[in-house]
């Protein structure tokens, strides 16, 4: 019995080492894992509302990415940079933050309902939706026209 437990444990160690940390196994194929969440950059051009809807259709708890820390912001920026190769000088990627009132102030929560704990936006003319800008290597948030089609990142 002791030998059986050792062999089973040994196989588990080999399996986990072959599959990385084991965290990726919870993500759908083509998605990337980071601190218990899964992310995917979509090279489809959609308006903010259509991108939000598309993300909710990907999985039960899917939503446009909400960025809660500098560490997560860096992860998302790298993921976007790796997955969007063909870009224009002024290229943008939707995130899940949108202004909800007439004065263009951001709502107090992300599109998934979570609170805004981290902020990294560029002051600019008032638009309603926020995205990542290529000129900042996808690290700063910029105000954009919600009706313009851009690529986007979903999180589950």
UniProtKB/Swiss-Prot annotation:
Signal sequence annotation: 1-23
Domain C-type lectin residues, every copy: 34-155
UniProt cross-references to InterPro entries, sorted A to Z: C-type_lectin-like, C-type_lectin-like/link_sf, C-type_lectin/snaclec_domain, C-type_lectin_CS, CTDL_fold
One annotated Gene Ontology cellular component of this protein: extracellular region
Tissue occurrence: Expressed by the venom gland.
Disulphide bond pairs: 27-38, 55-154, 129-146
PROSITE patterns in the cross-refs: C_TYPE_LECTIN_1 (PS00615), C_TYPE_LECTIN_2 (PS50041)
Subcellular location as annotated: Secreted
Gene Ontology MF: a single term: toxin activity
Positions annotated as glycosylated: 45
Chief location of this protein within or outside the cell: secreted
SMART domains named in the record: CLECT (SM00034)
UniProt key word Disulfide bond: yes
Keyword Glycoprotein: yes
Keyword terms of this UniProt record: Disulfide bond, Glycoprotein, Hemostasis impairing toxin, Secreted, Signal, Toxin
Family: Belongs to the snaclec family.
Job description of the protein: Interferes with one step of hemostasis (modulation of platelet aggregation, or coagulation cascade, for example).
Note: Shows greater sequence similarity to the alpha than beta subunits compared to other heterodimer snaclecs.
Subunit comment: Heterodimer; disulfide-linked.
Protein's name according to its UniProt entry: Snaclec A4
Species lineage: Eukaryota, Metazoa, Chordata, Craniata, Vertebrata
């Amino acid at each position: 019995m002791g030998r059986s437990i050792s062999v089973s444990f040994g196989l588990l160690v080999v399996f986990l080492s072959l599959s990385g940390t084991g965290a990726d196994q919870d993500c759908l194929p083509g998605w990337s894992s980071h601190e218990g969440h899964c992310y995917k950059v979509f090279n489809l051009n959609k308006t903010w509302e259509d991108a939000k809807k598309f993300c909710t259709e990907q999985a039960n708890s899917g939503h446009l990415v909400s960025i809660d820390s500098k560490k997560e912001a860096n992860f998302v920026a790298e993921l976007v940079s790796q997955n969007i190769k063909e870009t224009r000088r002024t290229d943008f990627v939707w995130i899940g933050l949108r202004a909800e009132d007439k004065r263009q102030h951001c709502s107090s929560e992300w599109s998934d309902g979570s609170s805004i704990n981290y902020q990294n936006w560029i002051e600019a003319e008032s638009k309603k939706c926020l995205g990542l800008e290529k000129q900042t290597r996808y690290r700063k948030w910029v105000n954009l026209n919600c009706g313009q089609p851009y690529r986007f990142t979903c999180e589950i």
